[in-house]
């Protein structure tokens, strides 16, 4: 269980970090797709944990 919690913690930190880093880029219209990819990272990690 500790491993799962570690993955979730990393996912949350990565999600928050990518959100902070992506904020200045929202002024450019081409950056929206990259931000959506960052938003999907925690979902992918959770999917990998559930289906492993």
Swiss-Prot record:
Where in the sequence is the signal peptide annotated? 1-22
Q: Give the keywords, sorted.
A: Neurotoxin, Secreted, Signal, Toxin
Q: Does the keyword Signal apply?
A: yes
Chief location of this protein?
Answer: secreted
Q: In which tissues is it expressed?
A: Expressed by the venom gland.
| One Gene Ontology term, aspect cellular component | extracellular region
- State where the protein is found: Secreted
The domain of life for this entry's organism is Eukaryota
Q: What does this protein do?
A: Probable neurotoxin.
Family named by the database record: Belongs to the formicidae venom clade 4 family.
* The protein's name: Myrmicitoxin(1)-Pr6a
Taxonomy of origin reads:
Eukaryota, Metazoa, Ecdysozoa, Arthropoda, Hexapoda
């Amino acid at each position: 269980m500790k491993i799962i919690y570690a993955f979730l913690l990393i996912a949350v930190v990565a999600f928050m970090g990518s959100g902070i880093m992506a904020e200045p880029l929202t002024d450019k219209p081409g950056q929206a797709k990259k931000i959506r990819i960052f938003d999907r990272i925690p979902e992918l990690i959770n999917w990998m944990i559930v289906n492993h």
